[in-house]
């Protein structure tokens, strides 16, 4: 299998950040490790301690700064992450492109997204601290439209040319499999819950048909 393509930045993608620090001194952090990102528009340089030592993004590693291509699913994902700040990453240096996103050698928050129920004073302070644009948007659709209008992110045809149409098809097939697995697991969970409710209520009449959100459930 060929290695994922490396392309030069800048490339833009969607991601989220955590927030740490006292009021007035907040800093954006990586949502996984919690490492602070440098303010003032500076680029964060990705590092990796996995041996053998290499420069991020490594082809056989998961290192680098991660972001999603601007798509409906990714916009919903970043806007729906509780306790995190959605935004747009400006990636530079070597960038390894994948069907759903990319990993970059370095990057900075180019824009932060303030949603209708977001903390406006906090986002205003963070945008000023990071010299980032503050986008006041009403949801994922508006974020995706902003990216399309301003030419931010790699389009699906460009990604397909970079990673190959076969890998794109494989990626879509894998996402469909994951959706089916989730739906099947959720259905099993609902059946178990329905069974628990029936067992927990000794006054339930056997043979009775119960109506719930998932449809009819017949009491054995």
Regions found by a protein language model. Give the residues of each.
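Juxtamembrane amphipathic/hinge helix adjacent to a transmembrane helix
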Residues: 147-173
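C-terminal single-pass membrane-anchor helix
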Residues: 169-220
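Short acidic-hydrophobic, aromatic-tinged amphipathic segments that line or gate anion-handling sites
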Residues: 133-142, 157
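ADP-ribosyltransferase catalytic core
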Residues: 52-124
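Short, aromatic/basic amphipathic alpha-helical patches
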Residues: 120-131, 147
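N-terminal "first-domain core" detector
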Residues: 1-44
């Amino acid at each position: 299998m060929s290695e994922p393509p490396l392309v030069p930045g800048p490339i833009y993608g969607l991601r989220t950040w955590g927030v740490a620090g006292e009021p007035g001194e907040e800093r954006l952090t990586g949502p996984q490790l919690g490492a602070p990102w440098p303010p003032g528009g500076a680029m964060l340089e990705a590092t990796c301690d996995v041996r053998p030592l290499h420069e991020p993004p490594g082809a056989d590693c998961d290192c680098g700064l991660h972001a999603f291509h601007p798509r409906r699913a990714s916009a919903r994902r970043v806007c729906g992450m509780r306790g995190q700040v959605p935004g747009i990453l400006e990636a530079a240096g070597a960038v390894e492109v994948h069907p759903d996103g990319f990993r970059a050698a370095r990057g900075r928050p180019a824009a932060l997204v303030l949603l209708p129920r977001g903390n406006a004073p906090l986002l205003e302070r963070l945008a000023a601290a990071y010299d980032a644009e503050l986008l006041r948007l009403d949801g994922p659709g508006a974020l995706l439209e902003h990216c399309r209008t301003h030419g931010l992110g790699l389009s699906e045809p460009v990604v397909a040319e970079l990673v190959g149409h076969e890998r794109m098809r494989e990626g879509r097939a894998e996402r469909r499999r994951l959706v089916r697995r989730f739906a099947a697991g959720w259905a099993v969970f609902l059946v178990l819950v329905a069974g628990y409710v029936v067992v927990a209520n000794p006054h339930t009449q056997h043979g009775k048909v119960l109506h719930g959100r998932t449809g009819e459930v017949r009491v054995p």
